[in-house]
Amino acid sequence: MSKQSLVSRKNDHLDIVLDPTRAIAATGTGFGAFRFEHCALPELHLDQIDLQTALFGRRLRAPLLISSMTGGAARSAAINAHLAEAAQQLGIAMAVGSQRVALETAGDQGLTGQLRQLAPDILLLANFGAAQLVRGYGVDEARRAVEMIEGDALIVHLNPLQEAVQTGGDRDWRGVLQAIEALAARLPVPVVIKEVGAGISAAVARRLVDAGVAAIDVAGAGGTSWAAVEAARAADASQQAIAEAFADWGIPTAQALLAVRDACPNTPLIASGGIRDGVEAAKAICLGADLVGQAAGVLQAAMHSSEAVVSHFEVLIEQLRIACFCTGSADLAGLRQARLLQLSAC
């Protein structure tokens, strides 16, 4: 694919995701099926609740990840800078969007060591698509992606549905697991696998862990639907109809999280996919997540400034802190033991 086509596609994606009426799946995340048992006597000081955690040797002041969002369009440079500055100020993690354009063209879209300069202390994750592993990418490209941003780990994203409904998408996914296993064995940093909004099943998660993957982002249904995004940018009515049929496809985030945690009890898990506030983040942690990711929910703020991103996440962090307080949880370990009532099926 030409540089112009790649960049045009990334610009289309950004424009569509910025309009939630065009991209959000009607499928719920599943978190609405759960409600915390309220603790009317917490015996805690709200301001002393400890939200700290760690992953891959980096300390985080809160269990939050700015999820992979944008990596191709020229305007991504400002967005990524705003996100990095905010992540550093807040002490949370950040994953960049796909680095394919930066790896295959002369442009970097802000995906350089400057991100590390802006955020010297954060957990920073590089990213490219799994389909590229059977189209020529290997350890060298993975190293370049990580070194480009001075990252701590590499996300390899699984997006077979998006590729299947996308005009010109990658249709041959044979050999992807074997390529992931080879990459995990040879890359000197951890490999994280994530979906992009259709979820990861228990069976797939188990195969990934057996292949040497260090962590999994379940990235379930309920947030951005990339099938809906591709329907919105389809080249013709037939392609649009094909994509629209899958707009609600996927495993809801809560259901995926429960299943993968049961199948992989010792694997670090990230919950993303439609998590809108700190109460849902608290539910995700109680259900087994180590970190909670958010992407589209902060994109509008990221278009404006790092201060807007900080304000957005300060609200979410305070919501998470109050959820801990009102469940009698002094820290994240306590939150994982809180009583979560299931009111209905996910």
From Swiss-Prot:
Claim: Ribonucleoprotein is one of the keywords in the record: no
Cofactor(s) annotated in UniProt: FMN; NADPH; Mg(2+)
Origin superkingdom: Bacteria
Main location: cytoplasm
Residues holding FMN: S67, S68, M69, T70, S98, N127, K194, T224, G274, I275, R276, A295, A296
Disulfide bonds: none
Keywords carried by this UniProt record: Cytoplasm, Flavoprotein, FMN, Isomerase, Isoprene biosynthesis, Magnesium, Metal-binding, NADP
Pfam families (alphabetical): FMN_dh (PF01070)
Chain sites annotated for binding Mg(2+): E163
InterPro entries per record: Aldolase_TIM, FMN-dep_DH, IPdP_isomerase
Record's subcellular location: Cytoplasm
Binding site for substrate: R9, K10, S98, Q99, R100, Q162
GO MF annotation: an example: FMN binding
GO biological process, any: isoprenoid biosynthetic process
GO annotation, cellular component aspect: cytoplasm
Catalysis performed (reactions): isopentenyl diphosphate = dimethylallyl diphosphate
Known EC number: 5.3.3.2
NCBIfam families: IPP_isom_2
Job description of the protein: Involved in the biosynthesis of isoprenoids. Catalyzes the 1,3-allylic rearrangement of the homoallylic substrate isopentenyl (IPP) to its allylic isomer, dimethylallyl diphosphate (DMAPP).
Stated family: Belongs to the IPP isomerase type 2 family.
Record text on subunit structure and interactions: Homooctamer. Dimer of tetramers.
Protein name: Isopentenyl-diphosphate delta-isomerase
Species: Stutzerimonas stutzeri (strain A1501)
The gene coding this protein: fni
